[in-house]
Amino acid sequence: MKKDYYEILGLSKGASKDEIKKAYRKIAIKYHPDRNQGNEEAASIFKEATQAYEILIDDNKKAKYDRFGHSAFEGGGFEGFSGGFSGFSDIFEDFGDIFDSFFTGNKGQERNRKHAKGEDLGYNIEISLENAYFGYKNNINITRQMLCDSCLGKKSEKGTSPSICNMCNGSGRVVQGGGFFRVTTTCSKCYGEGKIISNPCKSCKGKGSLTKQETIQLNIPPGIDNNQQIKMKGKGNVNPDNQEYGDLYVKILIRSHKVFKRNGKDLYAMLPISFTQAALGKEVKIKTIASKEIKIHIPKGINNEEQILIKNAGMPILQTEKFGNLILITKIKTPKNLNSNAIKLFENLGKELKDGDEIDLLKA
């Protein structure tokens, strides 16, 4: 016994056209064969819903169905279509957004897959701040899909050729359904290829590519920053269909440095100084990230956590000949373990500076 068309769409008798369209749309999206390839139950549900929609969306056929049920269309097929394909047209006009994606989208995906380059790959490498300053060359080992040496991506044994798929006649697409409603789907036999590999290559088992390890020289330019990527063209996986390789993206991870902290092109470092150096000022020598010894001037009367700017002693600016700055942050060291002479000196200094017993917090 055939199912009631209203029941198939989850509707009650007397449903409006809008309700019929909404109900069918919901089922079509969920059970369309291209979204459920190989699922016979989904294909059956989709077919039933489509038949129900064809009848209920057409006023004449709906009236006949409401009066006579399924018997109205037995024997003579879908009579009533002779007056025009209004119900059928409605399907494509009202649900063009669904069916366009099924009918043309998959074709486009197959076409794009055959013409697209291979898959891109990612690789992370950790380097020191010094490596980032000077630049760095290193060999890295990657695993990727490369063109099969035996079949050169053709997927068949040497001396043999693929045969045309007899299910889709080489188109990669098959038409399902009958009557006035047909659905085009990816061929389940050749999976959209349009051909069958009768004698697959023994080396790659018909894939057209092999997994291989390769050693690649990586050149990291001076000034590279943390989390930046280097693109290595053609060092990704191969697409055997067109023999084009994807790219390799190497992500740079820079280790923390025990002295220097980086902020873009600039470097920051703490500068430990004594009370006397802070009070009187002094010229001192320091070493930069480049291990270069330079003289800097500590101005007299400098306070704790004040900054001293050293121009062009920061990081190289990528792909230029310019440099960032080095910013030194003073850290005045409090002397400990004083001997008797040092204690007397500080006591006398305190008297000279009139250090009192009271401190005004408002002057802090």
Curated annotation (Swiss-Prot):
Zinc finger (CR-type): 135-213
GO biological process, one term: protein refolding
Residues bound to Zn(2+) 2: 165, 168, 187, 190
Pfam family, one: DnaJ
A GO term, aspect molecular function: ATP binding
Keywords: Chaperone, Cytoplasm, DNA replication, Metal-binding, Repeat, Stress response, Zinc, Zinc-finger
Cofactor binding, note field: Binds 2 Zn(2+) ions per monomer.
Domain J: 4-69
Co-factor(s): Zn(2+)
Binding site for Zn(2+) 1: 148, 151, 201, 204
Highest taxon of the lineage: Bacteria
Induction record: By heat shock.
CXXCXGXG motif repeats mapped onto the chain: 148-155, 165-172, 187-194, 201-208
Cellular component terms (Gene Ontology): cytoplasm
Location of this chain's protein in the cell: Cytoplasm
Subunit comment: Homodimer.
Family: Belongs to the DnaJ family.
Its job: Participates actively in the response to hyperosmotic and heat shock by preventing the aggregation of stress-denatured proteins and by disaggregating proteins, also in an autonomous, DnaK-independent fashion. Unfolded proteins bind initially to DnaJ; upon interaction with the DnaJ-bound protein, DnaK hydrolyzes its bound ATP, resulting in the formation of a stable complex. GrpE releases ADP from DnaK; ATP binding to DnaK triggers the release of the substrate protein, thus completing the reaction cycle.
UniProt free text on domains: The J domain is necessary and sufficient to stimulate DnaK ATPase activity. Zinc center 1 plays an important role in the autonomous, DnaK-independent chaperone activity of DnaJ. Zinc center 2 is essential for interaction with DnaK and for DnaJ activity.
Protein's name in the database: Chaperone protein DnaJ
